[in-house]
Amino acid sequence: MSHGTKYRDALLFSLTLYDVNTGKSRLKELYAAVPGIRKSLLGVHAKRFGEQYHHLQRRRSVSSRGGSLRGSMDSLNDSGQNGAEDVIGVEDEEEAQKFRGKRTSISLDPAAAGEVMFTIEDGACFPSGGLANTHFQQRVINVSNAPPVSLKREKSGEWEIKQGSGGLVSCVDPIMSVNQENMWLANLGMNIDKKKMLRSTELLNVTDDSAPLAPATNTLGLPLMRQALADVLFHVIADDDIKEQNEDEQSRNVRWGHSSVEAGGVAPSQPWEEMSLLGVLNQYNRSNYKLNPVVVQEQDYNVYYGGISNGLLWPALHNLPEYIVADYDDPKVLYEHWCAYVRVNYQFAIDAVRNSRPQDFIWIHDYHLMLTGMIMQSLDSSLEIGFFLHIPFLPPDNFFTKYRLCAFPIMRGLLRFTKVGFQTHRDRAKFVELVGIHLPTARVTYDEKMDIHTVTYQGWSCSLGVFPVSIKNEDFLKVAQSAETIKKADDIRKEILGETPVDSARLLFSVERFDYTKGIKEKLLAYRRYFERHPDRIGKDVLYQVAVTNRRSVDTYRMYQDECIQMAEDINREFATDEYPNWKPLIFRTDGLQRADLVAHYLAMDVGVVTPKKDGMNLVAKEMLVCNPSAGLVLSTGAGSEIQFTMAGLHPDDGDKCYHRVVDVYDADHYADAFYEAAVEPEGERAAHGQRLNEFIMNNDIERWSTAFLDPGWSHLVIRQSEIKDLDDFYSLMMRTRDVRRQIVERVLKGIPIRSHFSISLSNTKESLLLACQPGTRTLHLKPSLEEDEQTEPAHFDIANELDEFEKDLNFMKFIQSDDVYNVEQFINSLQEYHPVSADKFRDEVIELGDVLTEADHFNFFFTDRDGTLKSYSCSYPASIQPAYSGVIQAQFARRCAQTCAIVTTAPLMRIGVLDVSTIPEGYYYFGASAGREWFIDPANKFKDQSIPEEDLELLERVFAAISDLLEEPKFKHFTWVGSGLQKHYGHITIAHQDAFNSVPRHQVRAIDQKIKDIIHRIDPDQHTLKVKETETDIKIFLKSESGEIFDKGQGIRLLVEHMKCDISNGTILVCGDSSTDLPMLQACLEANPSGVYTVWVTRSDELKTTVRELCERFGNKNFVFVSCPEVLLGGMAQATIREISIGRPGPRASHDSE
């Protein structure tokens, strides 16, 4: 078995190396020919068992608490025959794709006790926790060479784990910490060295803490763990289940911890977890996202990390060829080290795929792992894999000739990621340029609006974006604003500059890793030149340089660091003066600062100095100005942050420059001039410039960066064509289109491209509905459920409106993705064919509506009805999903043309209410349901009318129960799905007796109306509490208010105004409605602000038009307009969003603009 595994691994790696070097796909061909190899490599069966066990635990906790363990285990065994991974692990990739297509179909299994099941066409099924996917939610799987933690083993033998503080951790931790199911794969510095492998009996006695640490450090600057401790890790993993009775006393003491046992303590219940590394990791994973170690051969790792990554790729991508290790001039050394790099990338890729699920987003970081995407795609082509390069991408001109062996595979490897993010436009432009030169068959397109390059090469497409990394502002501000830090900063200034420094004395501060890319040597040369050119600054200015030592095991680093330290000593000796005996021109320290101390130094400084030769971003400049907005800044063009600041207009060629730019760090004279300009800059100007930088950084923090990168423009979830037989099929399908439409709306609003699968999903849904219609009609005849017999009256739905909305959405996506700047106008014009009169009438009404909206310019408040106003009536309320185009138009109107927006409807809030059918993201609109008697502001802010007595609600509940019983009778059962059906609102009940198409016979309407009146009379004979109101489409049962009146939308508006402390007496108000139930809303606004109200009514009823006109004129208001259909209103709103307005978009929805 062992020899077979070794042969398999050797074969797979050989094919991987061949594919990487040649761009072929031999590995994928092997998996297709012998699928068992892939299943074995990825541990498919183990993963299947783990997920089924997870599901078993979940089912037992929520629905099987009263059942026996035997029954639960039977359930696991049964599901094991048809589990998801069993289906995924089919004989080839083509079959796996078939499964992914099948898994989107759903039905209700009566035997599942109401549990939603996924159904496969061959009859196999597996339980699910929701309608559209499994109970496993989408996770972010973060993959990096270095871990987000530091590890330390105490002398007692116990391990200590602490959260890391490096740049990568700061960038990614906010998004990772959101979900504890997120996973971080990294190398902990513990790897396999076969030459040093010990027997497991010897490993139990490893207590020597004097063994030397590994010579290299990881990318966070943390030392790699020694080999002996790596062996302990493997021993723990392998022998965790050793029975205590088989251990000797010494071994047992090691497992329990010497101190506790020798002191007479009680052995812990889980002794390994007291001291083993595995136990520490398990404990960490219980309270954080999951941290999984990636273990590789130590010899490979040392060459991969300390060799080719830092000796070749690091200096090459920084365009510092003079620091490339000379050993790589030897083709043999280059090949051997390249093979090690591929092997480590191969192991990372396998671990990532093993730990991933189909819905996960896998995020790979930095130059150590540039081949993982290519290898992972060969294992599973459906994965969504993103890559972010934290360093520059500026290889030298000879990179593709002298180092051809690795240069071309790196280019091909990066193009196999779904999305690649660069720090700056400079880096991306270089990559695109090199693609055009060295991969001539690649097709490159550019979306100017989105600023996204898409490269298609060898059948794969990759999006290239620019995502400047930032910092988590709150973490630094919290420290900077503390009294202790402020006092510490004052102490630092006094210690360095003296108790009474001269007014012109300046403290310059710089902090970075002791790396040749940071330009420390050039900085020291310029600082010496500064005093030579400006001797008047001697005795006044001090440069405080922190250069944190790392990578001293690498010769180039050690020599560079020693040279800089000597230069620092020379400067202090050269410029020492008797006139200022306590003055020291340069403070040079090589140990790091804790965050509190670092921030205190930021507060103490007058000028920050950030002048790398080349850097991906360099967050130090941002940290400095967030903490100390009154400080000056000397910044080199080698920093990615300088490029970002320049593009933001903070250092224009002609105009006010917010920092002092060093164009060439090798030009000591100009560099010294930048020092001088910063030192003598007036404090007022310096503070003004720092404030502008501060505002920019505050508006572009790390959460915006991670959100922008992780927001996908693609999805592997597609709605397939399906057969619609019963109501559940129909409503389930419509709810799934709601989810797709929500994604479309969110992506359009955020400016993320709409990928083809959204259109495919909507097109497939439309085709499914058309196929289900009666021949030659747009009418569905559906069984109430599959359990009903053939004699049951089917539900009849005229779905003409639903089909039209799908067509509009498909047109909308075509227009919105076009490059034509007039695509919005083109889409508005496409709506004219849906006008009930004519296209000319549509255009006239849009123009008239536009005049009203333009006159108002910007609305302080926007109150509107939904059904009949913003959307045409549907065949039933569960099917009245808001189209994507409508959601975008309404959200854009709320963002650009109004401040406080609210949708007020008579529908309930939830349980097939307005929130269930809306596609607008949270934050754009408030939702007032039940005529405004219950409000949803955001998930943390909901409120209701508190004036309803509890006994009245109980009375209404009795009415609801009685009507529900009535609808169980065969004669009235079809009213369940007529129109909005039976709905329980907060404060009233609605039962539809007619649909929008008048398809219910009049005698049936009269019959159910009489039955309902009989129920009301029986429960409330004197109608002291209840009041019945009939409309054309429904009958409503209201609870009377304290005054005896029915709660209406006008009172709903007043409830909102009172609760949210709105002042509607000032400013402008837009009110939209379509029926008499909306009139109280208009009247309430007119009473509060007669001249500021503008109103739009979607109606063709002359009677309603007269009522609206008279109501407005009674208040001296002439700002009203009538349109014939919701498409006109939406067209006018869309037109309003693309015109110039005089008032910007403030308020809580500003966050959407930043996104």
From Swiss-Prot:
Residues 56-94 are annotated as: Disordered. SUPFAM superfamilies: HAD-like, UDP-Glycosyltransferase/glycogen phosphorylase. The keyword Glycosyltransferase applies. Its EC number is 2.4.1.15. It comes from Aphelenchoides avenae (Mycophagous nematode worm). It is an enzyme of class 2 (transferase). It comes from the Eukaryota. This is Alpha,alpha-trehalose-phosphate synthase [UDP-forming] 1. Transmembrane segments: none annotated. In the N-terminal section; belongs to the glycosyltransferase 20 family. The keyword Cell membrane does not apply. CDD domains: GT20_TPS.
